[in-house]
Amino acid sequence: MKRTFILMMDSFGIGAAADADKFGDVGANTLGHIAKACAAGDIEGRSALNLPNLNKLGLGHAGELASGYFPAGLKKDIEVVGAYGFAQELSSGKDTPSGHWEIAGVPVLFEWGYFKDHHNSFPQELLDAIVEKAGLSGYLGNCHASGTQVLDDLGEEHMSTGKPILYTSADSVFQIACHEETYGLEKLYELCHIVRELLEPYNIGRVIARPFVGSGKGNFKRTGNRHDYSVLPPAPTVLDYMKEAGGQVVSIGKIADIYANKGITKQVKGTGLTELWDRTLEEVKAAGDNTIVFTNFVDFDSSYGHRRDVKGYADALEYFDSRLPELFEILQDGDVVVLTADHGCDPTWGGTDHTREYIPVLFFGKPVKAGSVGRRETFADIGQSIAAYHGLPKLEYGTSFL
């Protein structure tokens, strides 16, 4: 029985990519800088980063290969039981869909559309069309913003006026924040559908529904009912090939949204690291032959990376690491586990955006030969390796190392 489990540690980069200069990210290193800050005692309430399970899978060695130095605080003299390496991104952006699609064998070689102006970010003709088609009385925002700060700035006005908060970032996104109770969740989703259709000429990767609750400034909180409305991947992914072959592809968290539901046979919701881990272990136990279980652990990115919260990121990594033995205990002989990321989001870096970084490539399980797989020239090597293992059609991009 062959099964593959992909654990996507969203934003967990391990060193500035070779083309980081094109993105203003030379020197970024999500893993390296978190480890350095913890080991140096720079973070109140933190000691050295302790990731024994990830480290024995080769994380520290992968980090050294990618950046030239071993992550501070991790033990180097250990037996590595998995295959480890790092991968450069072919895709033109450092965004979520590009990273995920390339990992599944389909790099994004075109340029996404972006709303680059920090104020009055959206074209007036687009805003007018949204107001007319959705029957809005107006809108708030129309700017680049942090998802939490924009709630403090505009949440109360949104509640009193009923006008949705529209904002964007350096990514190819159009985000809409509305209060779940005063505006309504389904109404927010309907608005996102309308905006998704109107954005077609602009080549924007995602519309993101950002529902929140709370009574006023300082206590607004985003909920787990986020929904991403992505464009379709431009070619079949390894997930599509698995589904077409009669296998199962289980999405946990926001995976289905990122692939616009293509290649997915089952969707499982989960919010927060604890619930995502719980759901993952449940689906691993239930998985049959020729199954891919794919979980996105979004909190690394959304809760800690973008918010530049080094302590929170470090604590989350240690929690993630602490759950790995539960997975080890239930693996079967034909199982392959993949741990990777889709981009970086260095919490020590300036700004609030993603960072262009190498990603870790960690494979383990009885079918996997332990040792270095070195530098991979595309994230698609991951998808190609999964396709080869399951006897699926060869992908256009990527080289298998299994």
Curated annotation (Swiss-Prot):
It catalyses: 2-deoxy-alpha-D-ribose 1-phosphate = 2-deoxy-D-ribose 5-phosphate; alpha-D-ribose 1-phosphate = D-ribose 5-phosphate. It comes from Aeromonas salmonicida (strain A449). The keyword Metal-binding applies. This is Phosphopentomutase. Its EC number is 5.4.2.7. GO terms for cellular component: cytosol. Mn(2+) 1 binds at D10, D342, H343. Mn(2+) 2 binds at D301, H306, H354. It holds the Pfam family Metalloenzyme. Keywords: Cytoplasm, Isomerase, Manganese, Metal-binding. It is found in: Cytoplasm. Belongs to the phosphopentomutase family. GO terms for molecular function: magnesium ion binding; manganese ion binding; phosphopentomutase activity. Transmembrane segments: none annotated. Isomerase that catalyzes the conversion of deoxy-ribose 1-phosphate (dRib-1-P) and ribose 1-phosphate (Rib-1-P) to deoxy-ribose 5-phosphate (dRib-5-P) and ribose 5-phosphate (Rib-5-P), respectively. Gene3D superfamilies: Alkaline Phosphatase, subunit A, Phosphopentomutase. The keyword Transferase does not apply. Its cofactor is Mn(2+). Pathway: Carbohydrate degradation; 2-deoxy-D-ribose 1-phosphate degradation; D-glyceraldehyde 3-phosphate and acetaldehyde from 2-deoxy-alpha-D-ribose 1-phosphate: step 1/2. One of its GO terms (biological process) is metabolic compound salvage. Binds 2 manganese ions. It comes from the Bacteria.
